[in-house]
Amino acid sequence: MLLEMDKIKITVDSKIGNVVTISYNLEKITIDVTPKKKKEKDVLLAQSVAVEEAKDVKVEEKNIIDIEDDDDMDVESA
């Protein structure tokens, strides 16, 4: 016989993980959750974005020019 007080509502955000088991008694509630695996497409997309960002950094580094002020070069000797 279930009483109205015995009802327990448990909500787990499915974006975080998958519920494996839910067990409870009057003293405690235990929820075992496994992390969700990323989809292979999402992982590949993240890797390609990281590679593109790395390429952008290298291009920016190549465009840096060090200018040294050498006064001896500007003076002509007669």
Curated annotation (Swiss-Prot):
It comes from the Viruses. Its main location: host cell. Induction: Expressed in the early phase of the viral replicative cycle. Disulfide bonds: none annotated. One of its GO terms (biological process) is symbiont-mediated suppression of host translation initiation. It is found in: Host cytoplasm. GO terms for cellular component: host cell cytoplasm. Keywords: Early protein, Eukaryotic host gene expression shutoff by virus, Eukaryotic host translation shutoff by virus, Host cytoplasm, Host gene expression shutoff by virus, Host-virus interaction, Inhibition of eukaryotic host translation factors by virus, Inhibition of host adaptive immune response by virus, Viral immunoevasion. Plays a role in the inhibition of host protein synthesis. Specifically, inhibits the initiation of cap-dependent and cap-independent translation. In turn, affects the outcome of infection by decreasing recruitment of inflammatory leukocytes and reducing the memory CD8+ T-cell response. Belongs to the orthopoxvirus OPG173 protein family. This is Protein OPG173. It comes from Vaccinia virus (strain Western Reserve) (VACV).
